[in-house]
Amino acid sequence: MLNKELLDALNEQMNHEFYAAHAYMAMAAFCDDNSYEGFANFYIQQAKEERFHGKKIYDYINDRGEHALFTAIPAPKTEFSSILETFEDGLAQEQDVTHRFYNLSDLANKDKDYATISFLNWFLDEQVEEEAMFETHIDYLNRIGDDSNTLYLYEKELAARSFDESE
């Protein structure tokens, strides 16, 4: 059984993961609308990953004998000025998620809930990778600047990205 405060926070995070999936789909739509199919694919794969994270938390809540509670998902931002802005927003979103997992870890540590601490460590490791990935993309896009040929090649690279739940 989970402490109520921790359970509420896990439910909130589960819902936030599904919100993040919506936000990434909005970024994909912007990319598709502007004929950047490779970047759109990147965000579609990100959305799949966020849904996987939400489902992982859902499963954990149920495995602990608790009930997952779903809330309304707010509409994400849908207007962007550039591909770079989508990546900057993605990084900000991942940084927010990292802080949310830090707060969850603090609650689990306070309760000495070692099973939840172990569960959350996977997400903390994942967040290090996510933030680093977005930072790399932002750095690369800044270096590319207005070079449309290099942007085209970079987009083609991202078009091949796929999400694998086993990673």
From Swiss-Prot:
Enzyme's top EC category: oxidoreductase
Keyword check for Iron: yes
Classification via InterPro entries: Ferritin (IPR001519), Ferritin-like (IPR012347), Ferritin-like_diiron (IPR009040), Ferritin-like_SF (IPR009078), Ferritin_DPS_dom (IPR008331), Ferritin_prok (IPR041719)
A single BP term in Gene Ontology: iron ion transport
Catalysed reactions listed for this entry: 4 Fe(2+) + O2 + 6 H2O = 4 iron(III) oxide-hydroxide + 12 H(+)
Keywords noted in UniProt: Cytoplasm, Iron, Iron storage, Metal-binding, Oxidoreductase
Single GO MF descriptor: ferrous iron binding
Ferritin-like diiron domain location: 2-145
Main location: cytoplasm
Chain sites annotated for binding Fe cation 1: 17, 50, 53
Subcellular location, record wording: Cytoplasm
Residue sites binding Fe cation 2 per the record: 50, 94, 127
One GO cellular component, as annotated: cytosol
Enzyme Commission identifier(s): 1.16.3.2
One protein family per Pfam: Ferritin
Record function comment: Iron-storage protein.
Similarity-based family: Belongs to the ferritin family. Prokaryotic subfamily.
Protein name: Bacterial non-heme ferritin
UniProt source species: Staphylococcus saprophyticus subsp. saprophyticus (strain ATCC 15305 / DSM 20229 / NCIMB 8711 / NCTC 7292 / S-41)
